[in-house]
């Protein structure tokens, strides 16, 4: 009998670091299941989760403050290996009898760590060799406090020029602490260090693979829904597309996909969705032409949040009407992913002990009485894309740039009109087409066009024209929390501008947005 892919599992306790989700993603990439819980989890909950090992993540607080977060005492008596990272190392040191103090030399950025003792955590890990023969590592630091004394039973494993305790270890108890961040790519050997902990020290097997995730999801969905029918709101986005493919494998024609064309999609997107999922993959899919309904409800509204709510509410109305026609549908499938689940719980610095449910379809009415099927709720976005590839979905679709839920409704500034949407989708298609042609699309993180509700004078031949303005937006980012505007070649921008103005009657001027995030947001609305 094959093993459950959740049999070996790592518990990551979150103290509020911006890098905490990165730790979880790195552990998953190694091939081991893990979950992210708040630092104030109870002993009973840890026992219930039954982790193979525990990682204490970083955080913005100071261990020297009396009310700052601490790991539950049970972490140190549970009998499993523990790794503390940055703040996690500091709270481990303080809780086990060592000392922590505010450092006069704060470290933020690259640092060279010298290994001065053997440890299972650093087995076969080095970037270079120092003059004294010790291994050196290039790592990423981000800390103001530092360990001033290690607990009894620990040895100092690594140091930097300004940090005497860069890493510590108690090999007997399998407790380890590192002051740097192995989860970020700037720490070159970071993945190897985490693999040493998860695989060699915790003895986890690599059971968490794309193929095993698919098999597990299909088995669970079959058991959950039995012979019942399931409905899915298919948008053509990554998450709902992967859910559709998983359910199709699990229950075949018992799945009905509802695709709502709201008139706010990208050029030819509706037909592409129908061709791919209906004709190519053979899914049972219903297309609802609802452009007039959405645009009529949006008429006269210019406030961004109000537009979002209208689009969401009309979608619910349309989806509910179609669902009522399917008498035997007992389940609603959703593309909820793990970051949604994390965000729906209280933040790591709050007081929620339990991960709470999250519904990514905004407020479907309770009276619909449909059970929820959420096969992606354990997965990060990169994992969803990988299993999408395994399921046969095309790379270009899975790795397409993000598109907002309200679609062009929030890329048209102010009131939404059919004329504006038609102009915008054509201009956007030209921009994206040229990015692909010039091999730039995969080198930027997100690119799109924005419709501005202002007119500008132009000249076409001998005639004066007075038409609309669009803005090109293109950014580069790692996490979408911060972003820099893309320094696209001037010749390329000129080409895109000329094509848009010459090929689209109704646009007289193209501008390029050179705002970073912060202070601007990536989307305009």
Curated annotation (Swiss-Prot):
| A family per Pfam | NAD_synthase
List positions binding ATP: 235-241
Keyword list, A-Z:
ATP-binding, Glutamine amidotransferase, GMP biosynthesis, Ligase, Nucleotide-binding, Purine biosynthesis
Cellular compartments per GO CC = cytosol
The UniProt catalytic activity note for this protein reads: XMP + L-glutamine + ATP + H2O = GMP + L-glutamate + AMP + diphosphate + 2 H(+)
Task: Write out the GO MF terms.
Answer: ATP binding; GMP synthase activity
Per UniProt, residues of the GMPS ATP-PPase domain are: 208-400
EC number of this enzyme = 6.3.5.2
List residues of the Glutamine amidotransferase type-1 domain.
9-207
What S-S linkages are listed for this chain? none
What PROSITE patterns does the record tag this protein with? GATASE_TYPE_1, GMPS_ATP_PPASE
Pathway(s) it belongs to = Purine metabolism; GMP biosynthesis; GMP from XMP (L-Gln route): step 1/1
The active site annotation covers: 86, 181, 183
Under the heading SUPFAM superfamilies, the entry gives:
Adenine nucleotide alpha hydrolases-like, Class I glutamine amidotransferase-like, GMP synthetase C-terminal dimerisation domain
Give, as one word, the top-level EC class: ligase
Q: How does it assemble?
A: Homodimer.
Q: What does this protein do?
A: Catalyzes the synthesis of GMP from XMP.
From the Swiss-Prot or TrEMBL record, give the protein name: GMP synthase [glutamine-hydrolyzing]
Q: Origin organism of this chain?
A: Colwellia psychrerythraea (strain 34H / ATCC BAA-681) (Vibrio psychroerythus)
